[in-house]
A protein has these predicted regions:
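Conserved cytochrome P450 K-helix/beta-meander segment immediately N-terminal to the heme-binding cysteine loop
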Residues: 44-76
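Cytochrome P450 heme-binding "Cys pocket" and the immediately downstream C-terminal segment
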Residues: 98-129
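Amphipathic alpha-helical interaction motifs in eukaryotic regulatory proteins
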Residues: 6-10, 64, 106-114
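Cytochrome P450 heme-thiolate "Cys pocket" and heme-binding signature region
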Residues: 32, 69-105
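Structural recognition of the beta-strand scaffold that forms the well-ordered cores
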Residues: 43-44, 87
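Conserved cytochrome P450 K-helix E-x-x-R motif and the immediately C-terminal K′/meander segment
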Residues: 1-32
């Protein structure tokens, strides 16, 4: 449950709120069936990806940690967690502090939740802000 709370919090409020630019290497590359010439800057918007209904379901704008607990198998959980971890970038450009950040997330959520009563709460829809 702790993992689900952390990943859902990270999904709803990613640490990086910008584009993740990359430059297409020499010779160009094919992306989603389209040729992209070398030197072209391409970007991924992590914030949009983390609110994608295709990846996180029709309630992607709702904070609902249970989405990580309702998956059918471990592979689906790992896949969803990897999608959330895109908030830290990917490949050789991934944030070197990712592991430290997750360690701190676990510590903070554990310590803060220790003094709270365990009652169910209403979901909060960020789209209504």
């Amino acid at each position: 449950v702790l993992q689900a709370v952390i990943y859902e919090g990270l999904r709803m409020r990613p640490p990086l709120l910008g584009l993740l630019p990359k430059i297409v290497p020499a010779g160009g590359d094919t992306l989603a069936g389209h040729f992209v010439p070398e030197g072209t800057a391409i970007c991924a918007n992590a914030s949009s990806l983390l609110r994608s209904e295709d990846l996180f379901g029709p309630d992607a704008d709702i904070y609902r940690p249970a989405r990580f607990l309702e998956l059918p198998n471990a592979e689906a959980v790992v896949s969803m967690q990897r999608n959330v971890e895109l908030a830290f970038g990917s490949g050789q450009w991934q944030c070197v502090g990712r592991h430290l950040a997750f360690m701190e997330f676990h510590k903070v959520v554990f310590e803060v939740s220790g003094g709270l009563q365990r009652n169910s709460c209403r979901c909060f829809l960020f789209a209504n802000l």
